[in-house]
Amino acid sequence: MEVRTAASPRDVKHYTTDRLREEFLIQNLFQADKINLVYSHIDRIITGAAVPVQEKLALTAGDELRAEYFLQRREMGLINIGGDGIVTVDGRVYEVNARDGMYIGRGSKDITFESKDASCPAKFYLNSAPAHVAYPTVHIK
């Protein structure tokens, strides 16, 4: 997980275009058979992508979150901008097809992503923020 620190508003107004891109642009987010995550100290948001092609991908907390599992103290929204896919949340299977979305509530432990067809893989765009209350997981069609 890449970690980005907050920038001072006084400093940002003097950044060049190249410096703005260096500090704020997220590149190469969608990579085959990987989950890529970028943690920003601005609002403690995590932006990411999961692109399962040949294998099922499991979402893990990593050392940066200092949590037992990714959504221990967070919630997550996702949208599938690729081919049809499957998201499994704590054993419950959701068929998340192209342009479908999901809200996954705080406390969800085991989350995996997979594609139905490797020749047209699912591409899950993810956003996660801190959560103080658990709400139920919802599939948005």
List where the protein language model places each region.
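Glycine- and acidic-residue-biased ligand/ion/polar-headgroup-sensing regions
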Residues: 40-56, 65-91
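Short acidic-glycine-tyrosine-enriched beta hairpin
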Residues: 90-106
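Surface-exposed beta-loop interaction hotspot
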Residues: 113-141
